[in-house]
């Protein structure tokens, strides 16, 4: 995500979303059939597993399963490689989804800026392909 942050500081910051804030566009904008992501692990399950706040994400149910396996087969730390793989893969897919959402937000902000610019040009009396007289000289 570093490349996105560099674009925010070096490029036009108005079309780069802030990664620390929630998206400004609704998640079903352009996708009327899109379902909302839901947590599989409940709050009570995460409390029982004593997960810290950073671990309470959409992959918490895989982490709970992995920690339980580690506890049950303690001396044999290699017995839980499948659970570890499932958790890592879920974290990877979650990261990819968040990057896609970030890119979607960036493109929607660019689209919004282009539309506002087009409306401002039309209000000035400039049609598509026309330039202002001071620019033409």
Curated annotation (Swiss-Prot):
A GO molecular function assigned to this protein is: NADH dehydrogenase (ubiquinone) activity
Q: Which residues carry this modification: Phosphoserine?
A: 73
Topology with respect to the bilayer: Peripheral membrane protein
* Major subcellular site: mitochondrion
- Spell out the InterPro entries in the cross-references: NDUB7
Key word Lipid biosynthesis present: no
The UniProt keyword set, sorted, is: Disulfide bond, Electron transport, Lipoprotein, Membrane, Mitochondrion, Mitochondrion inner membrane, Myristate, Phosphoprotein, Respiratory chain, Transport
Record's Gene Ontology CC terms?
A: mitochondrial inner membrane; mitochondrial intermembrane space; mitochondrion; respiratory chain complex I
In which residues does the motif Cx9C motif 2 occur?
A: 80-90
Ranges where the record places region Disordered: 110-137
Function according to Swiss-Prot or TrEMBL: Accessory subunit of the mitochondrial membrane respiratory chain NADH dehydrogenase (Complex I), that is believed not to be involved in catalysis. Complex I functions in the transfer of electrons from NADH to the respiratory chain. The immediate electron acceptor for the enzyme is believed to be ubiquinone.
Q: What is known of its domains?
A: Contains two C-X9-C motifs that are predicted to form a helix-coil-helix structure, permitting the formation of intramolecular disulfide bonds.
Name of the protein in question: NADH dehydrogenase [ubiquinone] 1 beta subcomplex subunit 7
Q: Which organism is it from?
A: Bos taurus (Bovine)
Encoding gene (name): NDUFB7
């Amino acid at each position: 995500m570093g490349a996105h942050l560099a674009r925010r500081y070096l490029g036009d910051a108005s079309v780069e979303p802030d990664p620390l804030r929630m998206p400004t566009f609704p998640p079903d904008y352009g996708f009327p059939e899109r379902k909302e992501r839901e947590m599989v692990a409940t709050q009570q399950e995460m409390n029982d597993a004593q997960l810290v706040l950073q671990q309470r994400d959409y992959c918490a149910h895989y982490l709970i399963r992995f920690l339980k396996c580690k506890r049950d087969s303690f001396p044999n730390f290699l017995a839980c490689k499948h659970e570890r793989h499932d958790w890592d893969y879920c974290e990877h897919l979650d990261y990819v989804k968040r990057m896609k959402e970030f890119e979607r937000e960036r493109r929607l902000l660019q689209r919004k800026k282009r539309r506002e610019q087009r409306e401002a040009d039309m209000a000035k009396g400039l049609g598509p392909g026309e330039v202002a007289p001071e620019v033409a000289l």
